[in-house]
């Protein structure tokens, strides 16, 4: 705990894939200052994605200064700082100079595909799944780190001599903000590295050996809510969580069975499973989230590949809407989709199907189908895919979802939110505060330093702007969903495997 009596603000740093943001909250969790800066995306080869870690730190530092200036407050009035970040993105730097030895390898980057294939050939897939809760995929940090050590001249030797440090973006920012004094991460970020045992809560020696990672490179792993150190200007750094886990906490989904969906380009669904690390039978990830005091809780995570991107396709490729916001109007003009289903398997299907060979399709077309029906079917597809993942989660953990909390750009679409409630048969709650990812980091930091007294105080601040209650009867709901499942089956295994 620190003395926060005269300090009435918390800063959340939200370090994302395309931009760095700083958001300042007051004691009522109102936003009083914001700043955002984009940074460059580097694509050195097809399927490769990199960021410059120095540019990430520079943009993040600048947004802090700008947000403070906008709010008209000084560092001395800030009780603590919380960090939420793009997960899995990997940085390796020289601990003496603070200079990266290579660009950050971003979560989207697929360069370590062959490393993952070799891990599977060597029979490590089941051990990785059991230990980390993750699938053997280039998405996660461990194989990215191995690639850097294997491909940057002298990196492996220097790492073994203890000269290099590894971190995800949270670790990198804290190391820079503290002037190289603190090398730390939290459990949520560690759980995304493919090197962390989510049951023992330790770096896993066998996985480090398999990947050839020197243990001395790795940060200390701590809870998501505690004081880790101080910035050079004296602000306590007191909260860390990966972006999706931070949104889960910002939505106050801290009890088992509570879930949130972030509707972005894709959709990220997380369900809190409490102290049970539930192993999925449906290809969902088992990951670490934040409990009521920022301690370790477990969650199931599933991703829908094409959510908001389906609406972008209507706008940019088909050109049947001028603005994503117009889709609500057109979808509401017709009483139903007239039997049309759009399956947006543009890049295959994610959870729970995991079919990279599926391709998108429109079904149920007749001469009576209008553009409005197709627009409606596109929005409905986002809700159907969300149900696919939530049904899998409920089957895995044996818990019934009481309500779904929502955030992200598409939640402004009232038609989509109502149809989501209808097809789930569950209330959908849209919060007044849309900045739930940054809010989660602020809450974690504020709890650690005594800025907020506890969960009850935070729950009082979680104002639901609108609740969407299901309006379809059970027969209608299941008939519509059966049509969706039939449509999905017709898209499966479409692409030739050799293609």
UniProtKB/Swiss-Prot annotation:
Keywords: ATP-binding, Glycerol metabolism, Kinase, Nucleotide-binding, Transferase. GO terms for biological process: glycerol catabolic process; glycerol metabolic process; glycerol-3-phosphate metabolic process. It is an enzyme of class 2 (transferase). The keyword Transferase applies. Pathway: Polyol metabolism; glycerol degradation via glycerol kinase pathway; sn-glycerol 3-phosphate from glycerol: step 1/1. Inhibited by fructose 1,6-bisphosphate (FBP). Sn-glycerol 3-phosphate binds at residues 17, 87-88, 139, 243. Pfam families: FGGY_C, FGGY_N. One of its GO terms (cellular component) is cytosol. GO terms for molecular function: ATP binding; glycerol kinase activity. It comes from the Bacteria. ATP binds at residues 17-19, 265, 308, 312, 409. InterPro entries: ATPase_NBD (IPR043129), Carb_kinase_FGGY (IPR000577), Carb_kinase_FGGY_CS (IPR018483), FGGY_C (IPR018485), FGGY_N (IPR018484), Glycerol_kin (IPR005999). Its EC number is 2.7.1.30. Glycerol binds at residues 87-88, 139, 243-244. It catalyses: glycerol + ATP = sn-glycerol 3-phosphate + ADP + H(+). ADP binds at residues 17, 21, 265, 308, 409, 413. The keyword ATP-binding applies. Key enzyme in the regulation of glycerol uptake and metabolism. Catalyzes the phosphorylation of glycerol to yield sn-glycerol 3-phosphate. HAMAP family: Glycerol_kin (MF_00186). Belongs to the FGGY kinase family. This is Glycerol kinase. It comes from Pseudomonas putida (strain ATCC 47054 / DSM 6125 / CFBP 8728 / NCIMB 11950 / KT2440).
């Amino acid at each position: 705990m620190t003395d926060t009596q005269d300090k009435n603000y918390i800063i959340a740093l939200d370090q994302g894939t395309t931009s760095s943001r700083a958001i300042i909250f007051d004691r009522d969790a109102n936003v009083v200052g914001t700043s955002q800066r984009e940074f460059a995306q580097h694509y050195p080869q097809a399927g490769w994605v990199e960021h410059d870690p120095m540019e990430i730190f520079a943009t993040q530092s600048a947004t802090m200064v700008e947000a403070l200036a906008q709010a008209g407050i000084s560092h001395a009035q800030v009780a603590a700082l919380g960090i939420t970040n793009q997960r899995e993105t990997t940085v390796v730097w020289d601990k003496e100079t603070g200079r990266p030895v290579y660009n950050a390898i971003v979560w989207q980057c697929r360069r370590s595909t062959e490393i993952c294939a070799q891990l599977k050939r060597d029979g490590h897939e089941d051990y990785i799944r059991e230990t980390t809760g993750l699938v053997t995929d280039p998405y996660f940090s461990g194989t990215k780190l191995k690639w850097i050590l294997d491909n940057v001249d002298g990196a492996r030797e220097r790492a073994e001599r203890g000269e290099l440090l590894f971190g995800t973006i949270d670790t990198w920012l804290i190391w820079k903000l503290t002037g190289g004094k603190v090398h730390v991460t939290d459990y949520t970020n560690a759980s995304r590295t493919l090197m962390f045992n989510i049951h023992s809560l330790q770096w896993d020696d066998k996985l480090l050996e398999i990947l050839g990672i020197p243990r001395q490179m790795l940060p200390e792993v701590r809870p998501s809510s505690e004081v880790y150190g101080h910035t050079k200007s004296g602000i306590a750094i007191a909260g860390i969580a990966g972006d999706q886990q931070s949104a889960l906490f910002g939505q106050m989904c801290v009890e088992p069975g509570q879930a949130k969906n972030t509707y972005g380009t894709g959709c990220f669904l997380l369900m809190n499973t409490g102290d049970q690390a539930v192993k999925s039978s449906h290809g969902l990830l088992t990951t670490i989230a934040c409990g009521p005091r920022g301690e370790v809780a477990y969650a199931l995570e599933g991703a829908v590949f094409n959510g908001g991107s389906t609406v972008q396709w209507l706008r940019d490729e088909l050109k049947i809407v001028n603005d994503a916001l117009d889709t609500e109007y057109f979808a509401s003009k017709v009483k139903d989709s007239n039997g049309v289903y759009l399956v947006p398997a543009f890049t295959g299907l994610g959870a729970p199907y995991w079919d990279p060979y599926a391709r998108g399709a429109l079904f149920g077309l007749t001469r009576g189908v209008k553009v409005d029906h197709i627009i409606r079917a596109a929005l409905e597809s986002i809700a159907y895919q969300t149900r696919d993942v939530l049904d899998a989660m409920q089957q895995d953990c044996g818990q019934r979802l009481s309500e779904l909390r929502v955030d992200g750009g598409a939640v402004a679409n009232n038609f989509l939110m109502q149809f989501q409630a209808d097809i789930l048969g569950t209330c959908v709650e849209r919060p007044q505060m849309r900045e739930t990812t940054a809010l989660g980091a602020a809450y974690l930091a504020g709890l650690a330093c005594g800025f907020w007294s506890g969960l009850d105080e935070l729950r009082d601040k979680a104002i639901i702007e609108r609740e969407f209650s299901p309006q379809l009867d059970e027969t209608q709901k299941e008939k519509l969903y059966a049509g969706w499942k039939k449509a999905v089956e017709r898209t499966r295994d479409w692409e030739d495997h050799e293609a």
